[in-house]
């Protein structure tokens, strides 16, 4: 069987980009069990309720749902268990300082295979207020209307 190359996205967290301002983005490895990897190869995962936290110098990913592997036996995993993120100590310490001092949170943005290994894209996030969300929605609608008007003008 040939070795996988490239990036294959399994799941993305579009809700996080709607609910938060993303300040910094980083790629981390994920420590998984065998049945979790098999379930991910089937393309099944949900990042919607996911978040990461730092505990005793280690970063953990929680709230991410990876359903049980259908052909799994008694060795199957728990769908919402804590999963350890694989980062260097300096990176964890730097993010811990930012989270502690300014009240930011760490959210998963995407889960993907990179050259056969499971990676998660995590972001340092600051919560949006309702008026920020409405403003972003209004900007998106205005941009869409302008593009539509330009394409109509081009068609004439």
From Swiss-Prot:
GO molecular function, one term: RNA binding
UniProt xrefs under Gene3D superfamilies: 2.40.280.10
Region (Disordered): 135-156
Swiss-Prot/TrEMBL GO biological process terms: trans-translation
CC per GO annotation: cytosol
InterPro entries in UniProt: SmpB, SsrA-bd_prot, SsrA-bd_prot_CS
Protein name in the entry: SsrA-binding protein
